[in-house]
Structures are given as C-alpha cells and as structure tokens.
C-alpha cells in the first residue's frame, strides 16, 4: 500500500451559527468560484452547533477574523492511502483502521478524518509528521507531493530518538448517539455545479427545516441538521439527509449503483478538542473487526461516523458493549 502526503496545508475553523451571515459571501466564492481564490482543499460541514471549515491556506485568506470565527491553532497536513490490487474491502475508514488509525493512536498522534465519496483523507498536525512517517514507514511506501509530483519518503532519517510505545491510561471512551436521519453520500460533476447552486445556497445558508436540537440523551436521538460539502482537487462530495436530497435535481446527483443509505453515530458528549488521541480508533477498530463499512467526518466539536442503514443496530450494540467493558475496567 502507498501513503501519500499531499501538498495541502489545512486550517480547521468553526463559524458560529449566529455569525454565518458574515461569511456567506466568502463561502459562496469558495464553493462556486474556486479559481478566483486558488483554493484546492475546501470542506464545509453543518452541524447542530456550528459550521466546520477545513480549508487550505489560500481558502483561509478569504475568511475575515471575527468574534464568530474560531481557528484551531495547528496547521494540518493531509494524507490518503492508495490500495493496490482489486481486493474488495469494507468502504471508508474501516479499511485503514488497522494499518493507519490504530498505529497512530498507539503513538499518541491526534488525527482528524474527512471521508468523501471518492476517498478518505487523514489529517495530522504538521508538527507530528516525523512521528507519522516513523510509525507507518514499515507498512507503507510513503510519498510526499512536491510541486504536484510524488517524491518517495523513507523513515530512515526519523528512526532514531523515538521511544518505544508507552502504554498509558486507556483513552476516554466517549458517549455515542444515533440521530434518526437517513443520509446519502453523493458526488456531482463540477461542470453541473451551477445548475444546483441556488438549491445548495438555500440548503446551506437559509433553510433549516430539520430540528436543531443537538443529539443528546439516549443513543436514539431526534434528527439533527447535518450537511457536508467538499470540493477537493476538483472533486465534489456531498453528505446530506435523504429528505434534503429531494430538493435537488435527481439526474445531477450521482451515487453508488446500490443507492445505499447511511445512519450516523455521533461521538462525544461534550466538545472533543484536538489534543486527544484514539478517538477515531475507538470507532474504526471495532467496526473493522466485524467488517462494517464506515465513512468518518471529524468536525470542530464532535466526530461523526456513517454506517450502512441496515447495520446501525449492530454498530450501536458493538460500541455500547465496548463502553460498558471500558467502564468496568476503570477504577
């Protein structure tokens, strides 16, 4: 397998809902006129709490500072995995759970995930790159993009001075909830983006028909507002509620031949922050063990896994049993 470290240097931001009006113009520019901003990595995710943005440095320049904008301190580098051969595996984050997510958690590297229709992006802090290379060099051929060209990276230069894995206290097992929404994962030909622009602007900025209550209480919670749009290196990916999809022209949105619907597992009872390690691993690992596909989208406050609709009961059971098992071990 190959691990590619892409050229994007990404910032992670949160726009408070009351301040969205201040950012409507720059967001529309990034959504529909990327050539004017030279932004190559743009992701916008609406959650009950806020709007999370992941943008490269060119996109970041478009966003004025304000009291409504929070910016995570770190600059994040973007990686993805290329699988050689045609072995059919579970989709999404599940297929990299053992090879990438678990080893990085063991070496105390905090990761963010952004699954799209096309691929899964792994974001790591720029300052952690040497640890990432050292950790994954035996498992992967690692390449770093320089000027658009992949340049081989070896772990030899970073192999000294790294201690053995220190097994500290078990990571916090965060509570989970499952909103009632049914989601679809879609793509769109960028050339047809203008044809859905009006609907997309309405859904993102003006239409909030889904209840705004955060997923709180029991594991089965009410529906929540959640909409994820990414435009990365010319490829579009959209995650939306199946009810919202009906607002769009059906002939322009593309999905897999099965037309599979997905349910959400929302991770975190309170904002997760960016320093804790192993959050993705505690979800991806158990699902990989039973070969259940999962898309995974990290946001500024909480994490979100999308699993096949017919597997949601099994997934909730697996993750709750893990919670109970961990709780029984804690003093």
From Swiss-Prot:
PTM section of the record: Phosphorylation at Ser-14 by AKT1, promoting the interaction between CASTOR1 and RNF167. Ubiquitinated by RNF167 via 'Lys-29'-polyubiquitination, leading to its degradation, releasing the GATOR2 complex. Ubiquitination by RNF167 is promoted by phosphorylation at Ser-14 by AKT1.
Family matches, as InterPro entries: ACT-like_dom_sf, CASTOR1_ACT-like, CASTOR1_N, CASTOR_ACT_dom, CASTOR_fam, CASTOR_mTORC1
GO molecular function: arginine binding; identical protein binding; molecular sensor activity; protein sequestering activity
Residues annotated as binding L-arginine: 110-111, 273, 279-280, 299-303
Subcellular location: Cytoplasm, Cytosol
Ranges for domain ACT: 72-137, 259-320
BP-aspect Gene Ontology terms: cellular response to amino acid starvation; cellular response to L-arginine; negative regulation of TORC1 signaling; positive regulation of TORC1 signaling
GO cellular component: cytosol; GATOR2 complex
Keyword Cytoplasm belongs to the record: yes
Residues that bear Phosphoserine: 14
UniProt similarity note: Belongs to the GATS family.
Record note on quaternary structure: Forms homodimers and heterodimers with CASTOR2. Interacts with the GATOR2 complex which is composed of MIOS, SEC13, SEH1L, WDR24 and WDR59; the interaction is negatively regulated by arginine. Interacts with TM4SF5; the interaction is positively regulated by leucine and is negatively regulated by arginine.
Function: Functions as an intracellular arginine sensor within the amino acid-sensing branch of the TORC1 signaling pathway. As a homodimer or a heterodimer with CASTOR2, binds and inhibits the GATOR subcomplex GATOR2 and thereby mTORC1. Binding of arginine to CASTOR1 allosterically disrupts the interaction of CASTOR1-containing dimers with GATOR2 which can in turn activate mTORC1 and the TORC1 signaling pathway.
Family annotation (PANTHER family): CHROMOSOME 1, WHOLE GENOME SHOTGUN SEQUENCE, CYTOSOLIC ARGININE SENSOR FOR MTORC1 SUBUNIT 1
Protein name in the entry: Cytosolic arginine sensor for mTORC1 subunit 1
UniProt organism field: Mus musculus (Mouse)
Origin organism lineage: Eukaryota, Metazoa, Chordata, Craniata, Vertebrata
Originating gene: Castor1
């Amino acid at each position: 397998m190959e691990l590619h470290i892409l050229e994007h240097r990404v910032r992670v931001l949160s726009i408070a809902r009351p301040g969205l009006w201040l950012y409507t113009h720059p967001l529309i520019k990034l959504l529909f006129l990327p050539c004017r901003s030279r932004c190559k990595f743009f992701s916008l995710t609406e959650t009950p709490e806020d709007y999370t943005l992941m943008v490269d440095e060119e996109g970041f320049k478009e966003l004025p500072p304000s009291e409504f904008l929070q910016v995570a301190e770190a600059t994040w580098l973007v990686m993805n995995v290329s699988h050689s051969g045609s072995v059919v595996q579970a989709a999404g984050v599940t297929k990299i759970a053992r090879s990438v997510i678990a080893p990085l958690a063991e070496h105390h590297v905090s990761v963010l995930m952004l699954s799209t229709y096309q691929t899964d992006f792994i974001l790591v802090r720029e300052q952690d790159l040497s640890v990432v290379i050292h950790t994954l060099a035996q498992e992967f051929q690692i390449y770093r993009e320089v000027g658009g060209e992949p340049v081989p990276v070896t772990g030899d230069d970073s192999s000294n001075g790294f201690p053995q894995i220190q097994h500290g206290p078990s990571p916090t097992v965060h509570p989970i909830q499952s909103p009632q929404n049914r989601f679809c994962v879609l793509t769109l030909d960028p050339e047809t983006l203008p044809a859905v622009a009006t609907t997309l602007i309405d859904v993102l900025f003006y239409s909030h028909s889904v209840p705004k209550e955060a997923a709180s209480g029991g594991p089965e919670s009410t529906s929540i507002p959640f909409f994820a749009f990414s435009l990365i290196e010319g490829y579009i990916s959209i995650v939306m509620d199946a009810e919202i999809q009906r607002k769009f022209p059906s002939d322009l949105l593309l999905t897999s031949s099965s037309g599979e619907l997905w349910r959400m597992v929302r991770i975190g009872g309170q904002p997760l922050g960016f320093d804790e390690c192993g959050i993705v691993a505690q979800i991806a690992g158990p699902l990989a063990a039973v070969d259940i596909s999962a898309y995974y989208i990290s946001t500024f406050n909480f994490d979100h896994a999308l699993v096949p609709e017919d597997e949601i009961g099994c997934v909730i059971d697996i993750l709750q049993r893990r919670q109970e098992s961990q709780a029984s071990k804690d003093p």
